[in-house]
Structure formats: structure tokens, C-alpha cells
Amino acid sequence: MKWSWLILVGILCAIVFETTHAMSLQEYAEKPFGRVLMLRHALAPGFGDPSNFQLRDCSTQRILDEVGREQSRQIGNAFRNAGLRFEGVYSSQWCRCLETARLINVGEVEELIGLNSFFQGIVQREATLASLRKFLQDLPPDGDPVLLVTHQVTISAITGMGVSSGAAVAYDPVSDQAQRVTLPTD
């Protein structure tokens, strides 16, 4: 009985530690965890997208406000100040993600359909995640990290972690492990 109690307490402590421990951006820059830094787009007020959503028409989408634009610039400055370099910068095709990635300004931004939001069924969840998993699987295990600017649902589906706007999770596709990275805007 005593051992089962200790095991239960140990498991609970491990769960709490796993969900609360985050590495600082400086720690991540000095020793990146995995090859991928997943970033949720910066603040875009509202919930979901309007019913008239069209992929290439930002006027039909929820977009960054000025606070979100400033948040994006601050994230980019924090990346540069930490000396963080990215091998590639990839973004969802949604306007709020593309604008976040461009305002961060740490490299040429490439659209990646595997980063698109399947929250409202605009794209199919399984096909989108299959595309992203293929991209992650094809990443060489060594090299500078890649930055993926995407949505809450995508980050959660891959890492099991929820994130707020402008928050980051480091992900290792080889071990399928993830760790939060604290940004100055958190």
C-alpha cells in the first residue's frame, strides 16, 4: 500500500513538472531542444474565422491587431537578442500567421499547408496533420532549428500542449517530446 501511494505521488509530481516547467528563450538559444520551435500566431482578437473565410483574402479572416503586430516584432527582437538562428521559417497560409512570421523577421517565410488550422473544418484535420508529420519526419536530425508559425489546434495536436497567442513550444520530432519555451511576451 505504501509503495503504491509513493508511486502515485511520483507520477503526479512528474505530470505537474512536465506541464509547468519551461525553458527560457536564452536556454533554448544556447541548447535547442529538438529541431522545431512551434509558435502560435500573435494576438488576433476574436475566436475562429468568419463564415465567409477565403484563404487568400485577409479581409475575410481574423487578423492581428496592433497589439499582435507589436508582439510579433518583440518576439523577433527577442530571437535576435538571444542569438537564435533558424534554418527555415514556415507558416500556415492564414493571414495572421503569415503576418506574425513576416513581422518576426528572422528569415524568408515559406507557406506550409501542414500548419493550416483545421479548427472550423476549413481544411481537413487528418490530411493537414499528415502533411505536417511528413514535413517533421523529413527534417534532418541535426542543424539549426526551424520556426513553425501556426495555430493552437495544430500545436496541441502535435505536442499535446495548449498555448496562448505568441507562445512557443520546442518540439523534437525524433523523440516526439515537447517543452515550453518562455518568451519575453509571455
Indicate where each model-derived feature is located:
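Bacterial N-terminal signal peptides that target proteins for export
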Residues: M1-I7
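Bacterial N-terminal signal peptides
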Residues: I7-I15
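N-terminal signal peptide c-region/cleavage motif recognized by signal peptidases
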Residues: F17-T19
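Active-site-proximal alpha-helix that buttresses catalytic centers in soluble enzyme cores
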Residues: M23-I113, F118-G121, M161-D186
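Generic beta-sheet signal
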Residues: G34-V36, D144-T150
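Short, surface-exposed amphipathic charged segments that create phosphate/polyanion-binding patches used
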Residues: V123-S131
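A short, acidic, amphipathic alpha-helical segment used as a generic capping/interface helix at domain edges
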Residues: A130-P140
